[in-house]
Amino acid sequence: MKKILVPILAIVLMGCQEKENVNNDTAQQQTIAALLEYTVVNKIFQDVGNNGGDAVLSSESSASGKSSVKSEVDGPTITVEPFDLTSFPKTITVDYGTGVLCQDGITRKGIVTIVSTGWYRSVGSKHTATFDNYYHENFKVEGTHVVENLGLNQDNNLEYGVTIADGKVTAPTGVAVYYSENTTRTWIAGSDTPLNIWDDEYLLNGNQSGVSAAGVEYSLTVEEALHFILLPRGIESGILDVDIADLNDVKINFTNNTITIFGQIYPFSS
């Protein structure tokens, strides 16, 4: 998303300069920085959700084995306690140690702990992830990430409620960005290959909000479901409404690659 928003931000700045009541240059720069920070933080927490679900699915697959520890040459060590198919809640520990270069080219380190009340496909199951000195590349991740299985929708696709509370991402420079989320993810492709997250596609609806490193508040509301693909990572379609500082009702349309600012429509390239 960051590659998409970079040209968008240039348009935002241009649009801001056309308004008489716009903030000064410093405020404009802080607004742009806040949006750029959002793209990084959002990507990190979406990644947490994807990999957390993968860890729970992998744990279920291996629960009939004889070892509670799963080690991979190119992945983390996953520990499941209690290690059986029926006892819940389970604590699933995903340990990246001092650093693992994963299949998607991202280096992760530290520990993600997931407490699951049932298996990932079980309706009503909740999966609560917390972090112990966990890093996505050089960004430290904190907060509580909860996924709840809401069951099948009318199209027979699984829906999951996602809540992120007290989300915090600290950059290598020491500055921190705060983030929260209340969304619904609909699993529309890849559910028949549960051990391979890279063919997954999902629709995202709901709200996200946060505070930038400079204290700029922002909120984003999905107007039309965002269609995410994981490999190559991107947004295929959907409409996102953005309110940030004094810049309100910006619409980013990923379906036709346009952005609306102050009623003016501009194209962008994805």
List where the protein language model places each region.
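Sec-dependent signal peptide recognition
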Residues: 2-7
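C-terminal motif of bacterial Sec signal peptides marking the signal peptidase cleavage site
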Residues: 12-15
